[in-house]
């Protein structure tokens, strides 16, 4: 029997999850091993509850670390600026539906999953990966990438394991600073991502309703008859002189 190739994925956030799904479904000759420093989403929820209610912080299982990544405990808005009707985006939405999201998100202009659904969706995705033979190592931290002849050939973990691999995918998010430092020290080419700074703006909902709908229809919203939803908006501007842009993000009307 031919030995399967091994691919190690570091991180089980959105990038790691969809990378694993793609490999497991399309490359049956590949053994997928996922290393996640945090906990499964169920235990992660317990750790977050302990933080909120008892001020007890787990440094490896919290709002930033764990299955699903940093966005798991957000409100589940599905936003994209790369083409809502592109085939890749459609495939992502269909995958969410496959694992428990409401089918309506395939037609909605502003699809929204909700935090409560994310736990079920992630759990179902994990079960699916395991059924296809993927190995998921929770509570395990990748400490170093083994590089030979300018090629990643495996990883070492905090618990002392060495995992040989034909390829390594780093889907760590932005907070794995020790790993980034190790890669830099080993001469791996790193490229800075552009930096964005954000701040919160609040407007009275009544003001937005009037600005967007005008006086007549704004009153329909205020009467609460349900025929017209509360108004929202999106603004964007690019300074052509230095090609810097500003845009609104994560609008929460109501």
Model-derived segments and spans:
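Residues forming the flavin
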Residues: 1-95, 99-254
């Amino acid at each position: 029997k031919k030995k399967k190739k091994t691919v190690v994925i570091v991180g089980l956030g959105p990038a790691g999850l969809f990378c694993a799904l793609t490999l497991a479904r399309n490359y049956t000759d590949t053994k997928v091993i996922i290393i996640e420093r945090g906990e499964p989403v169920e235990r992660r929820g317990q750790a977050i509850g302990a933080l909120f209610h008892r001020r007890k912080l787990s440094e490896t299982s919290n709002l930033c670390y764990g299955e699903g990544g940093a966005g798991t405990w957000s409100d589940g808005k599905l936003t994209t600026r790369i083409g809502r009707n592109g085939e890749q985006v459609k495939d992502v939405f269909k995958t969410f539906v496959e694992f428990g999201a409401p089918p309506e998100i395939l037609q909605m202009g502003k699809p929204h999953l909700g935090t409560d659904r994310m736990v079920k969706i992630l759990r179902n995705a994990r079960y699916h990966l395991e059924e296809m033979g993927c190995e998921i190592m929770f509570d395990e931290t990748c400490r170093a990438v083994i590089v030979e002849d300018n090629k990643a050939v495996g990883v070492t973990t905090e618990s002392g394991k060495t995992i040989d691999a034909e390829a390594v995918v780093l889907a760590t998010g932005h907070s794995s600073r020790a790993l980034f430092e190790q890669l830099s020290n080993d001469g791996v080419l790193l490229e800075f991502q552009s930096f964005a700074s954000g701040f919160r703006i609040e407007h009275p909902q009544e003001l937005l309703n009037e600005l967007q709908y005008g006086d007549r229809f704004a009153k329909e919203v205020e009467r609460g008859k349900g025929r017209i939803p509360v108004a929202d908006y999106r603004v964007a501007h690019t300074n052509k002189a230095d090609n810097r842009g500003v845009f609104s993000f994560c609008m929460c009307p109501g």
